[in-house]
Amino acid sequence: MTAEMWGRRPRDWAELAEPSNRPLFATVLECLGVGEGTRLLDIGCGSGYAAVLAAERGARVTGLDATPELLEIARERLPAGTFITGEMDALPFEDESFDAAVAFNALQFADDPVVASREAARVVVPGGLLAATTFAEPERNESTALHLALEPLRPAPAPGAGGHLPYALSEPGGLEALLSSAGLEPVSDGEVPLVWGHDTVDEAVRAVLASGGGAMAIEASGEEAARAALTEAAQPFVTPAGRVEMHNVFRYAVARRPV
């Protein structure tokens, strides 16, 4: 899933999608002990929503993402931050540059999650922490219904292609095993329940269309077909007040680079 796809509708992603994950961001930043002066690397930082929360805790934040359009918004949100275009598999930083690093819902999209995890471990100081998050199992996330609605509209992945599935690391122990493969020592793990809430069905549809998967569906099958599929899939989650509320569960794991 290319960076160009994630950059098609960056403002909708920034305003309609990222804020829904605030409780997850806050929980993990607390687990990392992010505070005054922490040198934090946010890998796959998107439009910088989590970076702002980290800065509010006193962190000196560097964000990396492959999508320039999202980084433009991150710079608007946090002028004091440093935001760099780059790939998770080849971080453009010296060894031991950061006190801690975090990858919110990012490693599953890496070309090689193991390589990306090792890169994250490389740039953290000995004794420093790395946290990663992802969806729990698909059946525990109501938003899976919307992801599945787009599957028939997207092109089939090339044989052997990987790194494009939202649930690639969702099985129990998946994150922990990945971080261990990078030579990190487990510290803690847990789950965070979230409600993805939108005032209207149209907002819920726009949030999904702003993702890389949404952009792929539009490119392959047209916006009208993608909107229709998502609108239908969202109906079970419409409240009497007309809002859309989807209950999801995310996993996180925290590990330490050995001293």
Task: Report each predicted region and the residues it spans.
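Conserved class I S-adenosyl-L-methionine
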Residues: M1-T38, Y49-L53, E69-I73, R77, L129-P157
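Conserved Class I S-adenosyl-L-methionine
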Residues: M5, S20-N21, S47-Y49, P166-V259
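Conserved donor sugar-nucleotide recognition element shared by glycan-biosynthetic enzymes
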Residues: A17, N21-F25, T67, P113, ...
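Class I SAM-dependent methyltransferase SAM/SAH-binding core
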Residues: R39-L91, V115
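A short acidic, Gly/Pro-enriched loop at the edge of an enzyme's catalytic core
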Residues: D89-A100
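A short SAM/SAH-binding and catalytic strip from SAM-dependent methyltransferases
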Residues: A100-P113, A136
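A short glycine-rich, Lys/Arg-flanked "PGG" loop and its adjoining helix->strand segment in the class I
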Residues: V114-L129
